[in-house]
Amino acid sequence: PTLCGLETYAGVHHLVSVVTGDLRDGLDALDLLEGTFPGGSITGAPKIRAMDIITEIEGDARELYCGAIGRIGFDGALDTSIAIRTVFMDDRQAVLQAGGGVTLLSEPGPEYDETLAKAERVFEAFA
């Protein structure tokens, strides 16, 4: 297990936590997935009200963005990651979703700059 481990990538630092545990009897990996996503580090708290506000502001459901990408093993093990800085493509366009961690003390200008910095590396991959 890791709590807020710092990982450094080209152009961005990222805090990563690894959580392990055992499910109560009668629950499976799908119950765990339903109970933990979207991740609290993405939504804020309280989670349900925060997601209501996010939907009001953004106008659409996030779908895969900030959802789970992962696998469920034949042994019932669940291994997931939160889909951030995600590109959705169809035959006509590519749409990039990225963001920063807004808090009560956040200032719009620096938050916007952080979002652009995070998205820049993805843009470069398409250049």
Residue ranges and their predicted role:
Residues 8-127:
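Conserved hydrophobic core element of enzyme catalytic domains
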